[in-house]
């Protein structure tokens, strides 16, 4: 992940260097809490569920520019998503607070964003839409 935060591309101009810096800082904060066991992390979130593991590998774990997976468990995804979302808060204390809350909610299954958010939030290598569905107004229905 360190290489991803150093990567310079479209994300710099769209997300903004300050937001990326905030994101990296919060990501490292959540990592330290995982390491201290202050936040839940055991690396076995999926147990031995092969189907769930394959889904995470194919859809949700982000890949580097060489197409190599750089996340290894759902807790990595929770860390990335919670850090990226919380980085938009207005102060460092709020960013940390909300990243921790988002992480716990994701881990406990209280909050589950759509697949596009899981796949794209915080991926600095590739810009992806975070919108899961689009709604179009139907002017006239004759059914």
Labelled PLM ranges:
Residues 1-143:
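Extended catalytic cores of very large enzyme megasubunits
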């Amino acid at each position: 992940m360190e290489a991803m935060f150093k990567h310079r591309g479209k994300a710099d101009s769209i997300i903004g260097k300050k937001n990326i810096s905030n994101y990296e800082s919060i990501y490292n904060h959540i990592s330290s809490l995982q390491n201290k066991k202050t936040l839940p992390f055991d690396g076995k979130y999926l147990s031995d569920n092969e189907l769930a593991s394959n889904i995470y590998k194919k859809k949700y774990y982000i890949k580097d520019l060489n197409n190599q997976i750089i996340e290894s468990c759902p807790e990595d995804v929770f860390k990335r998503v919670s850090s990226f979302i919380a980085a938009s808060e207005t102060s460092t204390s709020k960013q940390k607070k909300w990243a921790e809350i988002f992480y716990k909610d994701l881990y406990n299954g209280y909050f589950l964003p759509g697949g596009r958010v899981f796949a794209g939030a915080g991926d600095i290598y590739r810009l992806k839409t975070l919108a899961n569905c689009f709604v179009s107004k139907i002017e006239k229905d004759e059914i």
